[in-house]
């Protein structure tokens, strides 16, 4: 797996002015069979198209195993963190949900993927609380069609300054 090096995070003030702007592109990461197998173990989804290399070679239209769509979707969080998308001075960031998730192309075993993210909005949800909505595209190296597109919703809690600090 490719190591993802964190970049300098943006501030809340910067993000509030960046709707419609691309936040960045992640490093490439390889989706190998071990990663697919571990995801199958965690989720109980042992469908042959993901874990049986020989059968996939013979019977799959892709002639190899492919990553679970939900595995590809779940990788978004780690790739986004590596891009410095979570603002500095964040106390906590929680997944709030997804909108418009579309699985557009299979990720074949051994493929390299990366994340491209555009900020859609930063909505105030109370003192120091923001709902960040971003458009995400997971690209497959060497392929024209992306693996998936999804809008992520992340609830951010800004670290509060302590009285007297």
Outline where the language-model segments fall.
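Generic structural detector for well-ordered beta-strands
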Residues: 24, 28-30, 102, 153-155
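Catalytic strand-loop segment that frames the active site of acyl-thioester-processing enzymes
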Residues: 2-67
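Predominant activation on well-ordered alpha-helical scaffold segments within soluble catalytic domains
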Residues: 37-40, 73-77
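A generic structural signal for short beta-strands and their flanking turns/coil linkers
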Residues: 27, 35, 45, 90-99, ...
């Amino acid at each position: 797996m490719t190591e993802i090096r964190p970049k300098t995070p943006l501030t809340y003030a910067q993000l509030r002015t960046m709707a419609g702007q691309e936040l960045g592109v992640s490093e490439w990461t390889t989706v190998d069979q071990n990663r697919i197998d571990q995801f199958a173990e965690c989720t109980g989804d042992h469908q042959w198209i993901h874990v049986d290399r020989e059968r996939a070679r013979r019977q799959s239209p892709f002639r190899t195993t492919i990553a679970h769509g939900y595995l590809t979707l779940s990788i978004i969080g780690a790739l986004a963190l590596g891009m410095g998308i979570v603002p500095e001075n964040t106390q906590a960031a929680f997944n709030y949900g997804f909108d418009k998730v579309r699985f557009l192309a299979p990720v074949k075993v051994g493929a390299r993927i990366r994340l491209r993210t555009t900020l859609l909005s930063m909505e105030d949800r109370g003192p120091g609380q923001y709902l960040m909505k971003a458009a995400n595209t997971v690209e497959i190296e060497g392929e024209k069609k992306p693996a998936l597109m999804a809008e992520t919703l992340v609830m951010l809690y800004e670290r509060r300054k302590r009285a007297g600090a």
